């Protein structure tokens, strides 16, 4: 059954999920900042989040009947999956370092430079050139981040560098995750779980060597400070939920609408952090933040205009869908992990009617991307 998700019920679902996404994301950032203020171990906070992804995803994804893993050829696994896990690890650690060193509002303003990194990296890795309009749309982003940096009262060089490295890492993940999803048709949530497990496996020895002894000597751990432990637990759960909700929103709307929603989310996070954490800002600093976010919206609009075709706005997303229940009656070769339809390169092809809810098939022309932010 084909159709456009244009009804008022669908609009209400999208708006409700976006609101939930904004609240979860802002809560995650505020709690993360509170944790790092009292427990200054960004590597340990990263470890908790990776553990959360690893521990919660398997049982819940099975409960939700998310399609099982597909076989990925070992050479492909080492060539793309392992580097993706390393990139996720680097981006997560540096993101927490930036959150530790600078205010949430400034860290998220710097993260507005992601389109700049995306343009540069796609040119470096794939030789992809952008139209002049797209390059021009980057100027407000650069200008806004520059103004915010110069006027940031709590500026820290390590915080700035870490935020930039983190943004570059997330941008690389977005680019190469799209390739993995296209090549393997692995469910996007299963890819999140796979990267979380692999990142944890790589990171655990490093954490044991660099952070574990200092952590166990910290007063919060020695004295079993339940407030810090509860904040760490909440941070891990909220980070996991944020990823799940972000991917769910992406499945319901067009890529352009998702990009606009993501930019709006950043505004919400900045506003909430300023309200709750109360870090001092000047009006010029606010102008810089606003200009950077507006630049992101201009970039998204420029990308839309240069595609040469109209994209629907919220939440018109041309989507193929089938009735969810009963799942057992559907002839889905991936149900409960069965696999067929191998491609010539050893990877798998997803049936055309496979859902994002119980498969990862997206209609042709519908871009799918992971956003680990």
From Swiss-Prot:
Record key words, sorted: Membrane, Transmembrane, Transmembrane helix
Pfam family membership, one: TPT
InterPro entries named among the record's database cross-references: Sugar_P_trans_dom (IPR004853), TPT_transporter (IPR050186)
Residue intervals passing through the bilayer: 11-31, 41-61, 80-100, 104-126, 133-153, 157-177, 196-216, 228-248, 256-276, 282-299
GO MF entry, a single one: transmembrane transporter activity
Any one GO CC term of the record: membrane
Membrane topology type: Multi-pass membrane protein
Biological process per Gene Ontology, one example term: transmembrane transport
Major localization class: membrane
Cellular localisation: Membrane
Primary role: Putative transporter.
Family: Belongs to the TPT transporter family. SLC35E subfamily.
PANTHER family named in the record: SOLUTE CARRIER FAMILY 35
Protein name: Solute carrier family 35 member E1 homolog
